[in-house]
Swiss-Prot record:
Protein name, per record: Phosphoglycerate kinase
Quaternary assembly: Monomer.
GO-annotated molecular function: ADP binding; ATP binding; phosphoglycerate kinase activity
Signal peptide: none
Keyword field: ATP-binding, Cytoplasm, Glycolysis, Kinase, Nucleotide-binding, Transferase
EC number(s) per entry: 2.7.2.3
Binding site for ATP: K208, G296, E327, G354, G355, D356, S357
Family annotation (InterPro entries): Phosphoglycerate_kinase (IPR001576), Phosphoglycerate_kinase_CS (IPR015911), Phosphoglycerate_kinase_N (IPR015824), Phosphoglycerate_kinase_sf (IPR036043)
Top enzyme category: transferase
Amino acid sequence: MAKLTVKDVDLKGKKVLVRVDFNVPLKDGVITNDNRITAALPTIKYIIEQGGRAILFSHLGRVKEEADKEGKSLAPVAADLAAKLGQDVVFPGVTRGSKLEEAINALEDGQVLLVENTRFEDVDGKKESKNDEELGKYWASLGDGIFVNDAFGTAHRAHASNVGISANVEKAVAGFLLENEIAYIQEAVETPERPFVAILGGSKVSDKIGVIENLLEKADKVLIGGGMTYTFYKAQGIEIGNSLVEEDKLDVAKDLLEKSNGKLILPVDSKEANAFAGYTEVRDTEGEAVSEGFLGLDIGPKSIAEFDQALTGAKTVVWNGPMGVFENPDFQAGTIDVMDAIVKQPGVKSIIGGGDSAAAAINLGRADKFSWISTGGGASMELLEGKVLPGLAALTEK
């Protein structure tokens, strides 16, 4: 990566501004998945071990009006982070003003402070999300000229807390998480060890058009699963019953198939049910066609066998999107078996592109078997699409 990293700057005695991604799920004020906090620890620990004073910024959820602030404070995150670090985390509970400034100025070397949810600034004119110039300058003024971006999950957005701060400091550098995310995903797509197989699932073709187009150029094979299968089926005149379909994307699906040169591999059967919820019958289809009154909710056993074969010998695999409704045990076989087929390949570099695929790997107990699981769904999708991420572009060149 041709950008400066946290190891390229002297941190001792400096107030170091750090954008992390602590956008974690909360239920009744309790964190239900702390992966993003854990992922930020190496960078935070490095800064404080080097004698820096870490000032952390993160958003949590969406905040558009005053009422949205309810349940969106980062207070539970501050407590969780303190427990993980084994030291106090200063939490003034505000995003600006004298209370925040005094707390920052009172920090000593090796201490950590967490600023309140950056999106609280969106209540009055979307200042965070619209990269308000004044807000970026103000937050930048709280530090000593060093900004560390370690929030891959928001790297595809130009916000005040990443791009805005970057524009107003002497050095904007990458943290370890951001550096690893870019290295794994970009290298997999741009300079893969071959054979390189991409697996794309999920419900909508529209979400993945750019990704499919880019990967058809870069990968040796692109396997398609999930709900978007049925848009590809219908584009070829195959019966899909009541399955999910994007009628306005049939021409796009047809076009992708025509220009794929045989690289695009679709399922050959499905697991179908007579309803999405409250179904009374689940069965495997004979072939591609879904029965009238039924809908496809997972890839079938023949498809699993074909995908297993397509993955044999793969040295690089990028997976984004489940094969079916994996949250339901009746429709998780495709996702489980494809995961197992990926990780059993000898010497494979296996990467999950965040989002539902990451949740599937974690929930189904396969997370530790992958080389890398991305912390950013949208950001990883844009990297897979070959786009430049604003949060990365704003960092200082080496």
